């Protein structure tokens, strides 16, 4: 018979000051498959915790799982990440099936504690620092000191469900699912400090059968990303994202990165607010993205100052200056209020069969627009801004791509 485990029985204090790592880990280790470790009625401050299959970690509405603001309280979990190096996490699982995180409570990660806020914020080469106003400076990237690199990290797990949680202030990628199968996120809110770099909402790498629904992601970096960064030889596929709200200083929705292979994805009924980019589909040498569709996306883009990728585009579909390939992209029945046109950019036709149908565009420049008007941002494929190529209609820039179809409709009044 499954049982409910109270970490206080293992010595947890839950006063928000005492470090409860050891007591929480004892409670988690004591849980048999089917058991629930329930955090209730307090703030449980902790460093790194290891999870295992068959476990439910329930954080009740009156409870907070608080990540320690001291990096010394975290440890390497034993996974080498190809981009971030050794993985240092708040919660992690390496292998294990039937894992659930839930409960209606809050995970507070204390991300700002790992940043240097006195650092002169990064200013891109295109901008004269003397012209930067205080309002613009507050949009720029802060500096990293030393941080947990993958706050919630699951690798090689199956049948994972995360639902009814609020996660605050991640210092880096909030959720990472690497080499996982059958993952569902439902009614999850992630709210991160927008000046912290790399604080993605949820990042799926080399995973399959993914469902993300009814979630809110407010992030400094990508809200939702699907790549193969942790395992370039694999495929990330069979993805549905629906009924979500997103805001990002980078891309709200990203498919592909460098040599990643991503396929078979649907995004629908998503609202994007004041993001550097809305939709981002990228492939570089050895990478490919195919058969992805976006339906009923309502988006507002805004150019944010600093080193953020993107310059107010409603979408960027890009395999420029590479041997990567992108095909079968459909963007349908979407409304875009943006600062720059959309971009479809390839080399010698390696981007093809892109359909933009029944979409409306309205371009309204913001305060940073004069720095970047008329230039494409193809980062990370191409490091420098490029002059705009010819336009398909007034609202889409196309270069080096084949079979790009555009059918606009007037914006809604």
Q: Where does each model-flagged region fall?
A:
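Extracellular/periplasmic carbohydrate-active domains that bind, remodel
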Residues: 1-413
């Amino acid at each position: 018979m499954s049982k409910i485990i109270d970490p206080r029985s293992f010595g947890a204090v839950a006063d928000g000051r005492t470090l409860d790592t050891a007591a929480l880990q004892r409670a988690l280790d004591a849980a048999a498959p089917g058991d629930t470790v329930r955090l209730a009625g307090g703030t449980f401050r902790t460093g790194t915790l290891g999870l295992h299959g068959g476990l439910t970690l329930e954080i009740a509405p009156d409870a907070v799982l608080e990540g320690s603001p001291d990096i010394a309280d975290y440890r390497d979990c034993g996974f080498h990440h190809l981009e971030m190096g050794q993985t240092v996490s708040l919660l992690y699982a390496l292998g294990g099936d039937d894992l659930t995180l839930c409960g209606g409570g809050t995970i507070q990660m204390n991300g700002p504690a790992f940043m240097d806020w006195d650092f002169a914020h990064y200013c891109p080469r295109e901008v004269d620092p003397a012209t930067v106003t205080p309002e613009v400076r507050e949009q720029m990237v802060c500096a990293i000191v030393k941080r947990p690199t993958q706050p919630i990290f699951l690798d090689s797990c199956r049948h994972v469900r995360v639902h009814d949680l609020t996660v605050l202030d991640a210092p880096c990628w909030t959720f990472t699912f690497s080499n996982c199968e059958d993952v569902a996120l439902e009614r999850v809110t992630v709210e991160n400090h927008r000046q912290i770099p790399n604080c993605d909402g949820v990042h799926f790498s080399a995973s399959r059968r993914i469902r993300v629904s009814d979630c809110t992601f407010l992030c400094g970096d990508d809200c939702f990303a699907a790549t193969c960064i942790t395992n370039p030889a694999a495929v990330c596929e069979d993805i549905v994202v629906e009924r979500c709200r997103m805001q990002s200083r980078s891309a709200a929705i990203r498919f592909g990165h460098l040599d990643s292979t991503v396929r078979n994805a649907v995004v629908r009924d998503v609202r994007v607010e004041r993001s550097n980019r809305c939709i981002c589909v990228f492939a570089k040498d050895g990478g490919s993205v195919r058969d992805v569709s976006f339906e009923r996306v309502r988006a507002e883009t805004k150019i944010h100052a600093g080193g953020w990728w993107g310059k107010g585009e409603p979408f960027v579909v890009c395999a420029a200056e590479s041997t990567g390939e992108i095909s079968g992209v459909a963007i349908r029945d979407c409304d875009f209020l943006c600062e720059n046109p959309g971009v479809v950019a390839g080399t010698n036709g390696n981007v093809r069969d892109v359909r933009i149908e029944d979409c409306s565009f309205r371009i309204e420049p913001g305060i940073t627009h004069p720095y970047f008007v008329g230039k494409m941002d193809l980062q990370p494929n191409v490091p420098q801004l490029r002059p705009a190529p010819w336009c398909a209609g007034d609202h889409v820039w196309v270069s080096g791509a084949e079979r790009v179809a555009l059918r606009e409709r007037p914006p809604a009044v």
